[in-house]
Amino acid sequence: MKILKYTVEDKNNWNEFVKNSKNTHFFFLRDYMEYHSDRFEDFSLMIFDETEKLIAILPANIKEDILYSHQGLTFGGFLVDDKMKTETMLEIFESLKKFIKEQNIEKIVYKCIPYIYHIKPSEEDRYTLFRNDAKLIRRDVTSTIDLTEQVRYSKGRKWTINKAKKELVETFESDDYETFWELLTGVLE
């Protein structure tokens, strides 16, 4: 097993892997991640098996001697291909422990990807964290809306939606992550 630090030359391979992983999310596409390049020192990792096949990636940044599941993202953790098995994830963590020691990294802060984003639900990483005596330092709440079901809005929410319609507010899909991020951070402040 081989672990390599992500470089700009890896962008296409990285993005292709993200699109095909079983626990994917657009957060992990490089254009989205690099929005934070001025705030975080990227230390994303690519993990290859013995046949040189990319089997996992870890969006990450480094600060001092700590490797973080990327701090510029709401969540992170390993993205894996659809053939990932628990035994392989255990091997990845063993390789990762050796790798971080060689890099003089003292600790990893790991944020799991919420299961709702898994195309093929699995939690090899969580099990591996347990097997490695990882310490839980934070637990976040995950809430989802099933868009195939009719949403039942409260009166206040209906009023807000009708007001937005009267103001001709538009909603549409876009790949413009920078503008999305500006809107999102404005709303969350």
Predicted regions and their residues:
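Acyltransferase donor/substrate-recognition loop-hinge adjacent to the catalytic core
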Residues: 1-11, 122-189
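Short, charge-rich binding segments
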Residues: 87, 91-92, 98-103, 132-136, ...
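Conserved GNAT acetyl-CoA-binding A-motif
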Residues: 103-115
